[in-house]
Amino acid sequence: MALPSSSLSSQIHTGATTQCIPHFHGSLNAGTSAGKRRSLYLRWGKDNQAKKLGPSKIVACAGQDPFSVPTLVKREFPPGFWKDHVIESLMPSYKVAPSDEKRIETLITEIKNMFRSMGYGETNPSAYDTAWVARIPAVDGSEKPQFPETLEWILQNQLKDGSWGEEFYFLAYDRILATLACIITLTIWQTGDTQVQKGIEFFKTQAGKIEEEADSHRPSGFEIVFPAMLKEAKALGLALPYELPFIQQIIEKREAKLQRLPSDLLYALPTTLLYSLEGLQEIVDWEKIMKLQSKDGSFLSSPASTAAVFMRTGNKKCLEFLNFVLKKFGNHVPCHYPLDLFERLWAVDTVERLGIDHHFKEEIKDALDYVYSHWDERGIGWARENPVPDIDDTAMGLRILRLHGYNVSSDVLKTFRDENGEFFCFLGQTQRGVTDMLNVNRCSHVAFPGETIIEEAKLCTERYLRNALEDTGAFDKWALKKNIRGEVEYALKYPWHRSMPRLEARSYIENYGPNDVWLGKTMYMMPNISNEKYLELAKLDFNRVQFFHRQELQDIRRWWNSSGFSQLGFTRERVAEIYFSPASFLFEPEFATCRAVYTKTSNFTVILDDLYDAHGTLDNLKLFSESVKRWDLSLVDQMPQDMKICFKGFYNTFNEIAEEGRKRQGRDVLSYIQKVWEVQLEAYTKEAEWSAVRYVPSYDEYIENASVSIALGTVVLISALFTGEILTDDILSKIGRDSRFLYLMGLTGRLVNDTKTYQAERGQGEVASAVQCYMKDHPEISEEEALKHVYTIMDNALDELNREFVNNRDVPDTCRRLVFETARIMQLFYMDGDGLTLSHNMEIKEHVKNCLFQPVA
């Protein structure tokens, strides 16, 4: 059959409107995207009349042969990587042992008890703060300490090297500060001469080496309190190396900082200076400073600072606070207390990132209810009555509370932005830490539409974190973590909309430090945040879930082979990659059926996409669509062999799915499934019409259809029946074709697909994509500008999707997850290109391997 002349044109009739579209020479065989390769050629029926295709008619212009159409060119895809023999070769020997199940249950119980026992915060002793509390003379006037148990603790807890501090961690700054505080206290009470001498020897040895330690390991307020205590030590006659260059440098830093301090700032509003009042005693107006006392009687939750104020003022509330702390800890005090908000938020974040939060839903809700009850629109600190908010706790709280449906505003971040648009941890601070900027960055990805402050925070923190990665000597200001660099790398490469729960869990299992410590005025630990039990459960649970997933994948591979789909030469075989999608986010064992339905439905969207794209004739495709509409297996006899395989597999699979759905929903769902597929096939057909005649629709016309043809809605609407919830018509309408929620999922999936595939598809004859359609509407702009605009549309849609996900509380949680996570998996698959079709040589292959085949050690 001869190709038509390029000077001839055909017409598309849409209602009363007729458009002439030039025909073209050559193949219309299109590119590689998973959901939009609409390069079907027009086929004409035996009645020698133009076939009616959906809403359009294709007729010939004057002089054109209506039967002259291009010849179909066979499409070829890269072969699938995950063949049966490959999967078998990767199957680990791991099996879920009864002892593992028992240990998992034990750990779940123990961690639940940890959550339920959370009060004001569990933490370790601070020798530094305990020394300051031990200084307080008895209020009855006797020449004894008010808290003799704290003095005894100092005498009993000197380390072998003569220092005081945390035995299993050595930071020179921390040890020197604590040791200096302890030897001063012992000297004041004229006791422990041996301990004092050993402490002095340690100080002399380490003070000369301290410059070798990173400045970022210097505790908060060190340059304020350390020189002040040196002055006390000198007055007490302690033989310390006061003339060392390091000591002189610290003294100079203190003087410079105090000179920069406005005289009225200390009393105007609560600042972090309240944390170090013991180092500012010579300049503090004690009457004025009392106006900034916290409700609990402390000064910024610091026992040392509060002890110093009490010794100067005799304030009863200060004494009540110290009694309260010692009642909790016995014979010592921590570096700050309470830590109730910090502990709860970080514990929730820990179990979520490790992928074990599904075991602790009630405990998480209780913890977040507590935090929300103390939420402040100006921000929060580490404790409920802390008057100085910090961006670390605030950003963590904003992100987690928002994702759990609490009403919190991003305006809270304005507290921490300076006049230059930079973000800092504390008001007036000039330094930032990696962990606080990382938490702000993570928070910035759960933006709602129009939240400019979050967008500013995202840009600021991304810039900071990328610079931090380039600085190989960079350390965090607030924490000593096992692998903070790995955490930052993951967050920048896989931000929220690409970070699938199983991948994040695997990454965080590798990066999580069960012995991580934090830096305040001294080094401290939080056992309800950093704990070996979390890690042990995460590893056992990950491997257990992965074992079940491998079994499910083998079942689906058997379904694929027994249905004859491996014989189909025109389609892509991506069973493992497609199964990885639901396994990466709806991973819990109880959703096995939902994962199977999701995977089978997704495989059919790929098969039928490829079938309608370039393989089937219009007569046969019309017959296929009619067979679905009538649900009539008898029509299969009129189909060619490969289409028989497709329809028989389709018919049998969805009959089985419908029967299972009837049992779960308590009503017939077959007609519902049919209707879902009818809409899907109509969208495929419309794009086939456009592609056949090289019609470039307007952007709006394109998106209206393409957000459906991407097929995500079809997958979700059928899979939702198996989420364990009874779905009423009202619930189904909230995630249905007309819902904003489902539309945004399809829109963002379509746009990320198009932005990564349109160039390759255009080179292979494809004419319609979001970029090309937008350029048609705006011929004055360049391709680069059009692409940028499409990215902007997608980013805005993702923000709106966040809001729909968070606020759609009438929809069961699992259904909301299904919609939202399906949108996110598309962002992952298409982050660098067509991750489905080209999965064999893209990072998706490694994700599949890590998620499904490689247990964590």
From Swiss-Prot:
Residue sites binding Mg(2+) 2 per the record: D609, D613
Sequence positions that bind Mg(2+) 3: N753, T757, E761
Alphabetized UniProt keyword annotations: Chloroplast, Isomerase, Lyase, Magnesium, Metal-binding, Multifunctional enzyme, Plant defense, Plastid, Transit peptide
InterPro entries: Isoprenoid_synthase_dom_sf, Terpene_cyclase-like_1_C, Terpene_cyclase_plant_C1, Terpene_synth_N, Terpene_synth_N_sf, Terpene_synthase-like, Terpene_synthase_metal-bd, Terpenoid_cyclase/PrenylTrfase
Domain notes for this protein: The Asp-Xaa-Asp-Asp (DXDD) motif is important for the catalytic activity in the class II active site relevant for the cyclization of GGPP. The Asp-Asp-Xaa-Xaa-Asp/Glu (DDXXD/E) motif is important for the catalytic activity in the class I active site, presumably through binding to Mg(2+).
Protein's UniProt name: Bifunctional levopimaradiene synthase, chloroplastic
Metabolic or biological pathway: Terpene metabolism; oleoresin biosynthesis
DDXXD motif, short sequence motif: residues: 609-613
Note on cofactor: Binds 3 Mg(2+) ions per subunit.
Binding locations of Mg(2+) 1: D609, D613
Transit peptide: 1-33
Gene Ontology MF term list: abietadiene synthase activity; copalyl diphosphate synthase activity; levopimaradiene synthase activity; magnesium ion binding; terpene synthase activity
PANTHER family: (E,E)-GERANYLLINALOOL SYNTHASE, ENT-COPALYL DIPHOSPHATE SYNTHASE, CHLOROPLASTIC
